[in-house]
Regions:
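Hydrophobic/aromatic pocket-lining and membrane-interface residues
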Residues: 1, 34, 76
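Active-site-proximal loop/short-helix segments
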Residues: 1-3, 40-60, 64, 86-107
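A charged helix-plus-loop insertion that forms the helical arch/lid used to bind
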Residues: 1-16, 63
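Solvent-exposed, charged interface segments at domain starts and junctions
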Residues: 11-25, 86-99
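Glycine-rich anion/phosphate-binding loops
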Residues: 13-32, 65-71, 115-116
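A short, structure-level motif marking secondary-structure boundaries and short turns
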Residues: 14-17, 60-62, 138-139, 170-171
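Acidic-leg catalytic submotif of subtilisin-like serine proteases
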Residues: 30-42
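Second-shell residues forming the walls of enzyme active-site clefts
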Residues: 68-196
């Protein structure tokens, strides 16, 4: 059984080299097992910072510190690539700070843009194949969730210079209901700049 990503963060706190090695191995095993069953892509790694109170992110987050998240996600990505699978960072620009679960309600992050820089840094630093946007409203930039925000997707493309695939999070989640039914969700995400 693969460990929760938070376990890799705990290993990091004691031994950084061991944590990098473990993350690389986890990425390889995850990708190799999925590919052996015909699955060629996994929405991993979670790049959200572990602020503590978010139960939905919980132990899926590597660590509280952005630099540690970057190091462990990079090692995990190396393992994924060694087994022939791409990486998809999520949940852009960061879901770890808010407590509500976007599967069942609509989270709002009221921080200033400057306060979000640690959350955004992994997307600047990592060589990701894909990015999944979050069903969270970040009032500092837009009143739409990141999935439905041409401002956030534009920032990802133009400022961060990400040129891979931009995915929505699951459009059946409650956090996606802000724009109406499924057809509106698909059209709004596509018009905001999401690829899939």
């Amino acid at each position: 059984r693969l460990p929760a990503m938070a376990m890799l963060g705990k290993i990091w706190d004691d031994d950084q080299d061991a944590a990098r090695g473990a993350a690389r191995q986890v990425g390889y095993v995850l990708a190799a097992e999925l590919r052996s069953r015909g699955v060629d892509y996994s929405f991993t790694p979670v790049l959200d910072l572990d602020y503590g109170p978010s139960r939905v992110i919980g132990d899926r987050a590597f660590h509280r510190q952005s630099a540690v998240v970057i190091a462990l996600a990079a090692a995990l990505g190396e393992g994924l690539h060694l087994a022939g699978m791409g990486s998809c960072g999520k949940h852009f620009p960061g879901h770890g700070y808010v407590i509500p679960d976007s599967h069942v309600e609509l989270p709002v992050d009221d921080r200033a843009f400057e306060a979000m820089q640690d959350d955004i840094e992994p997307y600047r630093q990592l060589p990701l194949d894909g990015v999944m946007a979050a069903h969270v409203i970040y009032n500092c930039i837009d009143c739409n969730t990141a999935v439905f925000s041409n401002k956030w997707i534009g920032y990802l493309r133009n400022d961060i210079k990400f040129n891979g695939v931009v995915f929505t999070d699951d459009l059946s989640m409650a956090g996606a209901g802000v724009v109406g039914g499924m057809l509106n969700r698909v059209e709004t995400a596509y018009n905001a700049g999401c690829d899939m």
